[in-house]
Structures are given as C-alpha cells and as structure tokens.
Amino acid sequence: MVFLSGNASDSSNCTQPPAPVNIPKAILLGVILGVLILFGVPGNILVILSVACHRHLHSVTHYYIVNLAVADLLLTSTVLPFSAIFEILGYWAFGRVFCNIWAAVDVLCCTASIMSLCIISIDRYIGVSYPLRYPTIVTQRRGLRALLCLWALSLVISIGPLFGWRQPAPQDETICQINEDPSYVLFSALGSFYVPLAIILVMYCRVYVVAKRESRGLTSGLKTDKSDSEQVTLRIHRKNAPLGGSGVASSKNKTHFSVRLLKFSREKKAAKTLGIVVGCFVLCWLPFFLVMPIGSFFPDFKPSETVFKIVFWLGYLNSCINPIIYPCSSQEFKKAFQNVLKIQCLRRKQSSKHALGYTLHPPSQAVEGQHKDMVRIPVGSRETFYKISKTDGVCEWKFFSSMPRGSARITVPKDQSACTTARVRSKSFLQVCCCVGPSTPNPGENHQVPTIKIHTISLSENGEEV
C-alpha cells in the first residue's frame, strides 16, 4: 500500500522546495531496498518459469501459485522501485497524475496477492477434505473463473480513488499521499485484508481438523492391513489375476483405501507448504492493516513516521519472500527451481518432442550413474498421473484409468523376468513398481497406452526398506 510522508497531512497548499538528500542515509536505504527488489523480481519470475517448464506442476493449485507470483511480480517490478526512490529522496518526484496511478496499481497488486492466498486456502481445504473427488470439483474452467473474479474484485477496490473517492489532494506535487478517507480506508481494509484473512483462517482451521481426523483414520486402517504395510508398494501386474468374489471386493477396497491415502498424503504436504506462506502473509500484512485504520479514524493515535515506514515495508516484504518459502518447504519446487536455473527445462521440452513416454529406471540393474533396460510406458491422451517425489528429484509415473477397451495393445512375454521392478527411495516413503513391457518397442507394435491394473498399493510414512 502507498505510504504518506509524515508531514503530508500538515503540508501547505504551495509547493515547497525539496530538502537536500542525506547521502549516507540514501545509500543505506538504496542498498536495503535494492536487495529487497532484487530478491522479489527474479524470485517470482523463477516461480512462474518453474511451473511453466514442468508438466507435473501443471495443476489448478499451481496455477493459483503462478497467479500469486504474477501479482507479486507486478508489485515488485512496477511499484517497489518508485517506493524506494520516494524513500531515498524524501519527496515524490513524478507528479500528481502518476502518483494517483501508482497508488491504484499498488492497491491492485497487494489485493490480488492477498486474494490469491485466499483462493489457495480454499483449494487446499477441498484437496484435503475430498482428495479423490478433487479433480472433478476443482476443474481448470472453475479455476479460471475464480482468478477472473479475483482480479475483478481487486480492480474494484483499487480504482475508487481514481474516481474521486478520496480526500482533497494537496497542491504540492512533491507529496504523494495515502488515501485517508475513512470510508475508503474501511472499505479497502475489509475487502483487501480482513475478509480474505477470515476466509484463510477458517479454511486452514478446517484443513487442520480434517487432516487430524483423516490421519487418525488412515493410520488405524494401515494397522489393520498386512504386516508389510510399513512400506509403500506399488505393483502393476502384467495381467489381471483371477480372483474370487470376496477376493475382488477385498482388492478393490484395499486399492481404494491406498489411493486415498496416497492422494491425501500429497494434499496434506501441499497444505503444509502453503500454510507457511499464509503464516508469513499474516505476520507481514497484519501490522499495516492495524495501523492504517487507526490512523484514519483516530488521528490522535496515529503512529510515528518511523513506525509507519516499518509496517509499510513489512507488507511489501511479503511479496519478496514467497519465492524463498517454496524451495525451503517443498522438495518439488526445490528441484523445479534447480532445473530452471540449470536451464534443464528447455532441454527437456526439446527432447520430449521425440519421446513416446516416461521412463522408470530399475536400480537393481543400474550401474552407478547409469541406467540399463529402461521400462518405457507410452503416453496417451486420456490419463491420470501421479507424482513420486524423490530426495534427488521428481519422478513421474502414469496410471491410465480411462482408456477404452481395445485401444491398447502390448506384447507380454511369457518369461516372468520380463516384469521389471523399479525402486524409488523417498524422504517419507519407498515405492516398488512392477511394470509391464519390453525395454524397446517393437517396430510393428501399436504404441498406445497398455491396459494395466493396480493390484495392490499399500502405504506408510516410515519409508523402511522392503
């Protein structure tokens, strides 16, 4: 939000000559604010590129995170530089018209950033509460509508002062005031902060309650399963095994339970990461939105200029630290950031044009730093994919659930050794995959997605060896 010089409310109607610049103070402020801006601009660009360059991050949740990064990028690139110049010089040097436009863009970006966190909290609540139904509830079309409404509301809140909803501006154009009209301050504080904050807190309280309940239920379900449920095992059998009626029902129940546990674990992890983001948001913005209404409605209790500057820049700090939070709390983003910085995502995009699918590397047959007998599963157009996070990166596998009958063909050797096993050790769990298919496709083979069945998925967060 836009800052008001401490003597602006007492300013005269004539233009005052600007005071001389304090050089040591200007250098110190320039270094501090410059570092802040240099963290914010590249950091938010890195978030956007990380999602754009990695297909496994192309989800509605990550689109919301990109929207948050876009709002923060606009703030750090178009608003903060002029705020820094204003602080260093001690007066506004860009004229009255640009002051009004700059103030409106400031409110627009800050409001959009805060409302993005609000939408993300709602998304996480749905993801944790309904992990299996989440893809049908949160679709890309609904996500796009939510983002359009977000920017429309932010625009409505920000343009009021441009149409006269403000106190009279001083004639001195070296002063750029914050809008202290009490009615607008109340409207903007409620719309930009307090209503979104209430929604965020309610959603994350619900997420906490649901996560505790689901964790308790899923843990008790694991204890009643087989004794080897302390590992995470995924077996994709080469063909559907014949089962009796009770065996089929038991297999379906176990598969449903295990898939729910896998999806719930992922949603819970994402909620933790975004919970840290929201916690930092409250710490950064709450002081400003406490000080601003108090100064507007109770001028006698208006804080000093130094206090206002601190809480003012503390709010701006929130838009600069979000890109730091992601890699520190999410292995997924950490690896994506590293790939972007190493320009690996561009190479992956070029190589993916010639690839038929994704590859699983069996470590039991791998030499140090090399992989042999790769198992390749061709990519289809109607698949549902899950992500496996490893300590050294992100591995993807695909579960094809909606392919029509007869559309997939694969040659299955009779030799049992053709079923290759791949192990992936993770920070929180171990995955063992038994996948169907030859190492290299046959020339005359139809490269469609093979019809596969998940026989057993059992989970644990201990990550013990099989």
UniProtKB/Swiss-Prot annotation:
Major subcellular site: nucleus
Family matches, as PANTHER family: ADRENERGIC RECEPTOR-RELATED G-PROTEIN COUPLED RECEPTOR, ALPHA-1A ADRENERGIC RECEPTOR
Entry-linked InterPro entries: ADR_fam, ADRA1A_rcpt, GPCR_Rhodpsn, GPCR_Rhodpsn_7TM
Lineage: Eukaryota, Metazoa, Chordata, Craniata, Vertebrata
Protein name: Alpha-1A adrenergic receptor
A Gene Ontology BP annotation from the UniProt entry: regulation of vasoconstriction
Keywords: Cell membrane, Cytoplasm, G-protein coupled receptor, Glycoprotein, Lipoprotein, Membrane, Nucleus, Palmitate, Receptor, Transducer, Transmembrane, Transmembrane helix
Gene (UniProt): ADRA1A
Transmembrane listed as a keyword: yes
